[in-house]
Amino acid sequence: MAPEPEDDIMNEKNPRPLDEDDIALLKTYGLGPYSTSIKKVEKEIKEMAKKINDLCGIKESDTGLAPPSQWDLVSDKQMMQEEQPLQVARCTKIISPNTDDAKYVINVKQIAKFVVGLGDKVSPTDIEEGMRVGVDRNKYQIQIPLPPKIDPSVTMMTVEEKPDVTYNDVGGCKEQIEKMREVVELPMLHPEKFVKLGIDPPKGVLCYGPPGTGKTLLARAVANRTDACFIRVIGSELVQKYVGEGARMVRELFQMARSKKACIVFFDEVDAIGGARFDDGVGGDNEVQRTMLEIVNQLDGFDARGNIKVLMATNRPDTLDPALLRPGRLDRKVEFGLPDLEGRTQIFKIHTRTMNCERDIRFELLARLCPNSTGADIRSVCTEAGMYAIRARRKTVTEKDFLDAVNKVIKGYQKFSATPKYMVYN
């Protein structure tokens, strides 16, 4: 029997070295018809990039700075001395507007008034009477227009990060969501429908109902959905120590809102400042009433409101002033009532969506055991059921945990519920 070729190779003690022809043959493996041209172009690109970096003076460093040999500290210092900081002034009057010889009266605070001209970088159409401007310190020429001065506490009310709450997270409020979307989203997405009919879209919504029914939650969902600027104001923030401070904050708030393309202003717990006017003989609530009157004026006063939607939430609508509630200021009143059986079942499913629960839990049965309960009560039931599971050192929540939680929260905490008191007043 003849030995196999593989056995011959294994048995060779002195393998034959590769000659030049074999090496040349190995180098041709994996090469295509354009390999030589591609290598040539790649080499030219590397050389060109190296030449560009040498001309620009950029080293391969973390900072990307030019080498010290190319630094020109004298010219940099001269440039810094020429660009002096500007001084803030206010343009009080324009003399001979819309002409080449237009002059501007500016008032520099704590110094004097000056009649000045425009700098080289400013267009005459950019300057209006009453606006803040930046002027140089030598000739007091107007160099740049400045935005209006707004209190930082008002600027901080803008919601920068969108909340993570969507309409799917608001259970038992199907009708309320539709009404809210008609007021907020429809005029922004389809304004042509209102133009064709010749009507103005509704601009204000009052959300009222018992505590814990989802008024603020729905406002957070609106902020998540819309691309407009969302400003959140808590009623007690506008109650200030000094006379006129609250009204000034309201004016600056709506001034900032008008500067946006589209804006939604949400007043939470509006009964803190929107109470009905009365005379208690002491005058303690006069400042709060002035703040409320400023809101009334901004909502529908002499000046147009613009594309500003106003949402208000309260659980005491009976205490609000009638001037605040009239159509034109708040066009719609949306009541957030207690959820029905279907709504309570949906709320249970929403809150248990992220929980480790058994599969065969009867949420409809749990909803039947929670009559006249709000969404906040049901959330408390789910949290308490998780506490029962933690206490028993289990990793999943059973139906018995939910039943025990219902017995504890719904029945045990009944005396703390604010819903019956709300029903009495409203």
Curated annotation (Swiss-Prot):
Gene3D superfamilies: 1.10.8.60, Nucleic acid-binding proteins, P-loop containing nucleotide triphosphate hydrolases. One of its GO terms (cellular component) is proteasome regulatory particle, base subcomplex. It is found in: Cytoplasm; Nucleus. It comes from Oryza sativa subsp. japonica. This is 26S proteasome regulatory subunit 7A. PANTHER family: 26S PROTEASOME REGULATORY SUBUNIT. The keyword ATP-binding applies. One of its GO terms (molecular function) is ATP binding. SMART domains: AAA. Signal peptide: none annotated. SUPFAM superfamilies: P-loop containing nucleoside triphosphate hydrolases (SSF52540). The 26S proteasome is involved in the ATP-dependent degradation of ubiquitinated proteins. The regulatory (or ATPase) complex confers ATP dependency and substrate specificity to the 26S complex.
